[in-house]
């Protein structure tokens, strides 16, 4: 059986990348011998459950990472090793263990523009964003295969690297009962960080609340900006209207209890939450940020795409259009469910099976 190792910072975090890799591995372990290699996770348990046949190795973070990972790969002789973009990305390809090396990039091609936001001088910020981007391209060029999450990003990457493919993330949930889109509540899910744009969403809902004061907004997630966002909600007098709920263990139930899904991100790789919301029959209003929403949301079909990112009034108007028209919400919700079938796990998994088998035989 072909042996595959996924190298990831840790599996203790309840985030999108960890969820995606866990779901993928749990499906593919029927066809491949799979190991997750983490670093410094220690006694923290994996957040998402893994099938028993999947192996786990945690490298002590007190030893040099290169040495620990090299020893692990040479001892286990994997056929394929996968970097998910952690520190190992910069040296994994140098380890001579005879495995095929894959680099998966789960962010937008232009994410460096967001990551460099702390540089106040716009010219310096642009320069350093370009430096980081081309540094990433340089290291990625040493891998046997590069995988990105959207067709949009694939077109950008292939200008520099020929061995790049795009494979969508699959739906990671099963929803047996979809939303009826009648509850006066909208939902947003994600890490409470700058790139997710929840500061925008609070401004959007301030406008919505002026016309529809009986509607609520629930935000599910945790992160560094929680106190800052909570303060903004308080400042606008929306403490009883916008609720930051934290992390939930049953996100499907929450989707079912809401009527509209909202996404205010500045940048995304491939937003898993939009697939999840679609699978539960929710209409979507999202900023058309780089690079995933436009490949999930059919504008006017299962929701609305709003441009440019940060256009508060335009997004608020689209939300209010859905709030005012229940039949439109339900029609778009049904279309969401139809479109979500593209991202069923078994369909996406077949692409991974084909890729892994091709790499091993080449």
Which residue ranges define each predicted feature?
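Membrane-proximal helix-turn-helix segments that form the acceptor-binding/catalytic region
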Residues: 70, 125-145
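A conserved mid-protein helix/loop that constitutes part of the nucleotide-sugar donor-binding site
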Residues: 15-23, 184, 188-210, 224-230
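Short His-centered aromatic/hydrophobic patch
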Residues: 83-88, 105-108
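Aromatic "clamp/platform" in nucleotide-sugar-dependent glycosyltransferases that forms part
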Residues: 247, 266
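Short hydrophobic beta-strand element within catalytic cores of glycosyltransferases
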Residues: 283-287
